[in-house]
């Protein structure tokens, strides 16, 4: 029973970290990166490179997350069969519990945390992703998977702000009181 719990907890912890990293990476904005560069935060250079080439960190996250889920399911299922036997409902119950835990504890909760606290988790994410990418880069796995994504995506991750988005952003900032009275009323119909 101890091994079953260890396998389940390890699988969920690894997936939890992957989900936080993914949510933070996808939530970080170019403006945030510029602000942190002006503040001379050391981690922001890594974060900026990852945002510019988002396929590589996403490949690392999804690879580790898939391995955690797959190996975790195999080990937990095997150990559940060893503990509860082949004929009873024990394996089914363990599988159902594991499915709910993976969904809630390693997907929904960490992605909510990452999307909510992404500004505070920027440094953690930059370091975590750098460590996660390292083994994939030096085994060649990252290169192979990057080539696959290039066949499908072809630079689909370009981040630019359109005129409409800029106007909507300034309108929202004005409505939320970000600007002083003397800073509003500019004609943006250029």
Regions found by a protein language model. Name each.
Residues 1-179:
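Membrane-embedded alpha-helical segments of inner-membrane proteins
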